[in-house]
């Protein structure tokens, strides 16, 4: 889970055969940065999370679930519309820069999770440097 600028907020490690929607609750619970008091947290999700709105709202967030292609149509209709989900794809590409992570050679989830957390910390540091100079 990342914020609007691509800074990681939570990380959940699972097998490749687990669907993302089954990990939604764990990802929301694992957030390391909470929203400021009085500010509603918005969560943008893709079509794979249809039916998970209640799980998001029970954790105090507002779900925004768009079917595939609807975001692109909205960009054509409204030139001021800003896409949101591409930030997650950029974050994945930043993680892929750390060649130790792909392919996975670590035997335990603990060691692989530690390397992922280190990579997330490096991405966060780079984003802070870019944003704040």
What are these regions (language model features)?
Residues 112-133:
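C-terminal domain-tail junction helix/linker
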Residues 37-108:
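Helix-centered, glycine/charged polyanion-binding patches within enzymatic domains
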Residues 12-35:
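Active-site beta-loop-alpha junctions of metal-dependent nucleic acid enzymes
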Residues 24, 46, 118:
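Residue-level signal for inorganic ion chemistry
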Residues 3:
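Short, acidic, Ser/Thr-enriched surface-loop or helix-capping motifs
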Residues 29, 93, 116-120:
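Generic alpha-helical structural context detector
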